[in-house]
Amino acid sequence: MALLDVCGAPRGQRPESALPVAGSGRRSDPGHYSFSMRSPELALPRGMQPTEFFQSLGGDGERNVQIEMAHGTTTLAFKFQHGVIAAVDSRASAGSYISALRVNKVIEINPYLLGTMSGCAADCQYWERLLAKECRLYYLRNGERISVSAASKLLSNMMCQYRGMGLSMGSMICGWDKKGPGLYYVDEHGTRLSGNMFSTGSGNTYAYGVMDSGYRPNLSPEEAYDLGRRAIAYATHRDSYSGGVVNMYHMKEDGWVKVESTDVSDLLHQYREANQ
């Protein structure tokens, strides 16, 4: 197999099956959730449950220790006649502390699929990269790209299996397949919604206000860029947990392209001067 050659496995050596052999008493241990098995297993970290672990470090007065997860963001995506626009900010915060100024909150799953990040950065990055692996395996097995609907369903199924275990994720899956542009919202509870416009994160209410006032299905590409740019910029102005730069992607029929990465402070100055 090509994968064995890439991994450097000796030729002629038969790999062991990941499935347990009947009557052997041996259990598989894939180390992660895998859709390649007929009876997939969930490999949880050995030890206490994640929710109990975080509660034990919640600052109870005796330990006075608290874990602040990286969170706080504004992401948006909407469909229009020329594809899908995905725009995000770049600030990551842990509690009241700004932990990073330039975080890429768009996961490039493959040339025809994008995923946005909101919630816990570690959860979003891990599960969307795992989704990218499954999408690649689907292509190798079937000889065609996975649909946007199927990719979002895979992510939703993963979240359902880990429901109630302390995950924090709100993601939008954007892509283009045989049916045209697709946009889905998936969160840590396994919720999966299809729509024309979504926004997630702590600044989503401000972004929705701008998008609702300017969204039309027949927007031109430049009008769509300006709408996404303004929505993120004004959301970062009102939401202290959002900021940095506007990273914008355009999903087209021939794949996604990165439109721009513009500082929100410069955009707000431009808008203020234009209104004077």
Swiss-Prot record:
Signal peptide: none annotated. Changing G8R: In allele LMP7C. Residues 1-33 are annotated as: Disordered. InterPro entries: Ntn_hydrolases_N, Pept_T1A_subB, Proteasome_bsu_CS, Proteasome_sua/b, Proteasome_suB-type. The keyword Protease applies. Induction: Up-regulated by IFNG/IFN-gamma and IRF1 (at protein level). Up-regulated by TNF (at protein level). Up-regulated by tetrodotoxin (TTX) in glial cells. Up-regulated in Crohn's bowel disease (CD). Down-regulated by the selective inhibitor PR-957. Down-regulated in mature dendritic cells by HSV-1 infection. Up-regulated by heat shock treatment. The active site is at T73 (nucleophile). It is found in: Cytoplasm; Nucleus. It is linked to Proteasome-associated autoinflammatory syndrome 1: An autosomal recessive autoinflammatory disorder characterized by early childhood onset of recurrent fever, joint stiffness and severe contractures of the hands and feet, and erythematous skin lesions with subsequent development of lipodystrophy and laboratory evidence of immune dysregulation. Accompanying features may include muscle weakness and atrophy, hepatosplenomegaly, and microcytic anemia. This is Proteasome subunit beta type-8. It comes from Homo sapiens (Human). The lineage of its organism: Eukaryota, Metazoa, Chordata, Craniata, Vertebrata. The gene is PSMB8.
